[in-house]
Amino acid sequence: MTEQTARRTVVITGAGGALGAALSRQFASEPATDLVLSDLSQASLDATLAGLPEAGGEVATLLADVSEIEQVEAVVALANERFGRVDVLISNAGVLSPNGRIHNLRTEDWEHAFRVNVLGAVNGIRAAVGVMRPQHAGSIVLTASVSGLTAWSHAAPYCATKAAVIQLAKVAAVEYARDGIRVNCVCPGTFLSGIHAELPKEALDAIAGRHPLGLGSAADLVGAYSYLASDASRWSTGSALVVDGGYAAP
């Protein structure tokens, strides 16, 4: 993209979650932007679609499991075939891990976290660069976490996988810079979403107390993605943009 006003295509995985839905609304509201949204759940995708502004660009959807490369390639291919290019990939699909000390967690817990959080991001990069390299342009934004920079007890698989995503963004940034492709990641702190709805108030208060600015919302995060996807960040690659309400500051 040489001009921010040129029409662009944005692909978002994990579009059915709280952050994915907020990102979909954000990019749908930006001018000259067409979207391809993907998620594992049709019901979640339908809910995201229902919340999009009517005045936005075209939107296509496709169900996909990001741990399967063929399914991710199909999402990117849909974007390229329908809109003629892929300018931005937001690799946002991810899972939490069960709570537990390292020795108590099952092998399956580790494998599931790595397949979705790490392999899912790898598959997104693999699929996107296949289209972006011939364009000699593109921005890939991965969803990492402040948990990849700090330690959360009883959440080793999640912390380890998000640390891997941060390093993956750095390596991919170096590998694809000469192809005109930028790769960055966003490291959110804890934000209110559906997964917190059933937590008791004292648990929420304890989590909020670790964030000097308190708990955020998905709406507090979308600006970071919008920036990294835009020409305003054209000299940024390999960065981990922390948006965490000050959690990592102390």
Predicted features along the sequence, with ranges:
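Alpha-helical segment proximal to the catalytic Tyr-Lys
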Residues: 130, 174-175
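Substrate-binding pocket helix/loop in short-chain dehydrogenase/reductase
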Residues: 100-102, 109-111, 196, 207
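Residue(s) in the substrate-gating loop at a strand-loop-helix junction
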Residues: 145
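Active-site helix of classical SDR
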Residues: 125, 161, 169
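A conserved structural motif in NAD(P)-dependent oxidoreductases
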Residues: 210-221
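Short, small/polar-rich loop/turn modules that mediate ligand/substrate recognition or access, typified
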Residues: 84, 177, 182, 236-238
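Short C-terminal tail/terminal secondary-structure segment
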Residues: 96-99, 150, 213, 226, ...
